[in-house]
UniProtKB/Swiss-Prot annotation:
May play a role in photosystem I and II biogenesis. This is Protein PsbN. GO terms for biological process: photosynthesis. Keywords: Chloroplast, Membrane, Plastid, Thylakoid, Transmembrane, Transmembrane helix. Signal peptide: none annotated. It is a single-pass membrane protein. Belongs to the PsbN family. HAMAP family: PSII_PsbN. It is found in: Plastid, Chloroplast thylakoid membrane. GO terms for cellular component: chloroplast thylakoid membrane. The chain crosses the membrane at residues 5-27.
Length: 43
């Protein structure tokens, strides 16, 4: 394969992996440990 194609595939996989990890952190099991600043400062 050409170098440009390999770089494109690598960057695409990296982007998909980062997006998947961000969604898992936001909505998956680790989200229970996240703090909510709006709930901490209710008036």
């Amino acid at each position: 394969m050409e170098t440009a194609a390999l770089v494109t595939i690598f960057l695409s996989c990296l982007l998909v992996s980062f997006t998947g990890y961000a969604l898992y952190t936001a909505f998956g099991e680790p989200s229970k440990e996240l703090r909510d600043p709006f709930e901490e400062h209710e008036d």
